[in-house]
């Protein structure tokens, strides 16, 4: 499917012109449109084919320095949207107008679309692969192809637009044995291709490891977080590196730029041209950039939007994103990459004497404080370099900052988990508690 870019541009220009004629000093229009085609399988059977479209337009204005924002979904009456934004601006305090200047840039389309028949085949292949070895399991698969288009234009001449197509495949398997219930989930997002057999094989491997239930080792023991579970740790660092948190003084790293904050093996960065969540510009029209946050354990940069950067006395890093169309830009991330190590996942396991593997967790993350206590939804015990079975009723507690200073090993098995590209890692300094069988 192709979007009508001419109609979108005409609407954006009309909104800017009407806003300025109505008394706005400056104005900005952000349009977001998406079209999603999907196939949803439940209990091993096709449940439905999905076809959805959405379109939203956000107008941001300043009058007498006061900002106002109004949003419309679907067809838009330009004057009504302008009047609403200007009325809302009267409720806000004056601020420095922060808009990008620029010229018209249309970025190349990323990705390619596939027909619904291909989505059906991917879903069927994943289910057949899982049930070949475990015929008793119930599989749920959600496979879709999403086309997204973004247009950002303002009264200072900025006009940037981008379109991309992304595939998503999420699979979960329910395995019931008497009163023992287990759900294993996996999936991926990609602009290139989907490998349903590989996803199913990942789940099969975890079912193999869960054949036996065993007692967990307890106390302060090494914990191996798989690439699927490691984002729980990285979420805390993402909050600590947020320029707005630094400005507020709530980040524990506010005064540590240039200092060692994690183990020296850890390097974290963002890359605008890598992965399914890459993007050429942020929601303020600033070009995104390659940015190193932590290099060999040393804090290098915080990420910020235009307003936060100005208040911090630095330039924006191109990380001004809106949580929703009706929100103002705030510091945000589009991708997060952790430099992998050199040891395979099985090599990491082989060097563990007695440890826990965490693959899925229940509950929220640690927050910016770093303190956490989570239930292990899916985990395993390692003894003398071998996985001996699944652990149940187990909790892991500790502090993220402490754990990442006590890094034992980074794996080479980096994978995308949402917008986070991370390998597995082994950390110390955490406490494990569990029920004895």
Write out the residue ranges for each language-model feature.
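Active-site bordering "gate/hinge" segments
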Residues: 1-279, 286-289, 295-298, 384-386, ...
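Dual-mode signal for accessory low-complexity, basic/Gly-rich regions
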Residues: 103-104, 253-437
């Amino acid at each position: 499917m192709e979007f009508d870019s001419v109609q979108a541009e005409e609407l954006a220009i009309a909104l800017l012109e009407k806003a300025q004629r109505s008394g706005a000093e400056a104005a900005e229009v952000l349009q977001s449109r998406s079209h999603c085609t999907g196939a949803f399988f439940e209990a091993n059977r096709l449940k439905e084919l999905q076809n959805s479209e959405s379109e939203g337009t956000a107008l941001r204005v300043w009058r007498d320095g006061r900002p106002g924002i109004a949003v419309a979904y679907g067809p838009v009456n330009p004057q009504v949207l302008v009047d609403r934004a200007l009325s809302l601006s009267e409720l806000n305090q004056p601020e420095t107008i922060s808009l990008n200047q620029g010229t018209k840039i249309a970025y190349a389309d990323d990705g390619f679309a596939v027909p619904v028949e291909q989505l059906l085949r991917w879903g069927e292949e994943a289910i057949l692969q899982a049930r070949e070895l475990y015929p008793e399991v119930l599989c749920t698969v959600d496979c879709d192809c999403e086309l997204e288009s973004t247009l950002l234009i303002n009264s200072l001449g900025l006009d940037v637009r981008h379109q991309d197509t992304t595939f998503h495949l999420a699979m979960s398997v329910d395995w019931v044995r008497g009163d023992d219930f287990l759900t294993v989930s996996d999936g991926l997002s990609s602009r290139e291709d989907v490998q349903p057999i590989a996803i199913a094989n990942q789940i099969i491997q975890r079912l193999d490891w869960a054949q036996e239930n065993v007692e967990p080792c307890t106390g302060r023991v090494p914990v191996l977080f798989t690439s699927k579970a490691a984002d729980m740790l990285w979420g805390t660092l993402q909050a600590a590196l947020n320029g707005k948190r630094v400005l507020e003084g709530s980040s524990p790293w506010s005064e540590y730029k240039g200092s060692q904050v994690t183990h020296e093996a850890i390097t974290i960065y963002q890359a605008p041209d890598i992965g399914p969540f890459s993007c050429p510009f942020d929601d303020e029209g600033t070009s995104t950039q390659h940015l190193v946050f932590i290099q060999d354990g040393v804090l290098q940069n915080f990420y910020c939007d235009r307003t936060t950067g100005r208040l911090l006395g630095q330039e924006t890093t191109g990380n001004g994103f809106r949580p929703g169309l009706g929100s103002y830009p705030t510091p945000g991330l589009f991708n997060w990459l952790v430099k992998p190590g050199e040891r395979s996942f099985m090599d990491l396991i082989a060097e563990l004497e007695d440890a826990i593997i965490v693959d899925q967790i229940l509950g929220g993350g640690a927050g910016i404080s770093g303190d956490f206590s989570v239930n292990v939804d899916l985990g395993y015990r390692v003894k003398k370099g071998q996985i001996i079975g699944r652990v149940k009723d187990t909790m892991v507690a500790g502090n993220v900052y402490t754990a990442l200073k006590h890094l034992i090993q980074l794996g080479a098995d980096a994978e995308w988990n949402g917008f986070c590209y991370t390998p597995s890692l082994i950390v110390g300094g955490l406490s494990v508690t569990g029920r004895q069988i």
